[in-house]
C-alpha cells in the first residue's frame, strides 16, 4: 500500500492540576519560543492511552510491559492447569524466557564439545574501573539484565504456556521461544514499538509517534498551601496534623500524535485484525485519554476543546510552530486565540512546505479546509477513509 499518515491535533484546556511531575514533585515544564510552558511527557500520555485501549480492544489483542514476564507466563500455565505445581511452572518459565538474548543451549553443547569455547567463560573475571579483578562479573551483569521492562503480548504469554505443555515441562529450544516472541504482536506493541537491547531481532518499530504536550502560552507554577486536620485530636491538640504544599499549574495544551498506517499494517501482519479499527481505537484513545497524576486532588479530567484530524500521503506534519510565539489570553481566555493561531499556521505550512491533507476533519469548532463533525461522525468518516486506502 501507499504511504498513509493520520495526524491528530488536539487543543485541550486543563484546570489547576499536576498531570505529570518531575523528580521533585513539580509539574513538568519546557522552554519553547523563549517562554516557560506546561508540559506533559509523551510516555505519560502513551501510558494513559494504553490503559484506555481496553475500552476499544479485546484484552487478548493487547500486551503488558512488565518486569515480571516470567511470573506472567507461570500464571498462564496455572490458569490452563490449576493442578500444576506453581514452582515447577515458574522455574520452566524462567529458563524458557531466559533464552532470550542467550545462545541456544543445544548449539552451545555442540560448541563446547568441539572445544571452541573457553572453559568457565560464563564465570570469567572482569576488571573494575581501577583494573582490579572481580569474580563472576558476567553472571552479575546477566542478572542485572533481567531487571528490565519487557513488552510481551497476552497472546505471546499464552503461546509460551502452550509450549510448556507441548514440551511436557522440558526446556524448549531458543528457536521455538523466538518464534513465539516474533509472532503474535499485540496492538500496543505494533503502535508504540518494542526495543530488546539483548535480542534486537525482537525489536518492533513503532507505527505511532506521540509528542510531548505543551501549553500554547506561558505558564508559571503555583503552590497550594494546605493543612490536614486531625479528626480525633488530643485535648490539648491544635487540630492541624500536617502542613504541606502541592505544586500545580493550569493551561491550554497543544497535543499531537501521528500514525503511520502502512507501518501499522506491516507490524500486525497476518493477525486478522481490521487495521481501520485499530486506527480508530488509537485516535479515540489519544483524544479522550488523560494521565492520572494527582487526579484525586484536582479532579482535572476534561475533554478537548478541539480535535483536528488529517489524512496525509506525504509525511506527518506537527503544527506546534503555531505556538512558538506564546498565545496571549483574550477576554475569553486562551482557547479561541489558540485555535486561530493553529489555523493560520496550518494554512501557511500547506501553502509553502507541505501539501494540504487528503482529508481533514475537525471536532468542536470550525477550521479552514476541514469538515466539521462530532466525534462519532469524524471517527466514522476516518474509518471509511482508511478502509478505502487499504483496499
Show the residue positions of the predicted features.
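Basic polyanion-binding and macromolecular-assembly surfaces
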Residues: 1-39, 45-391
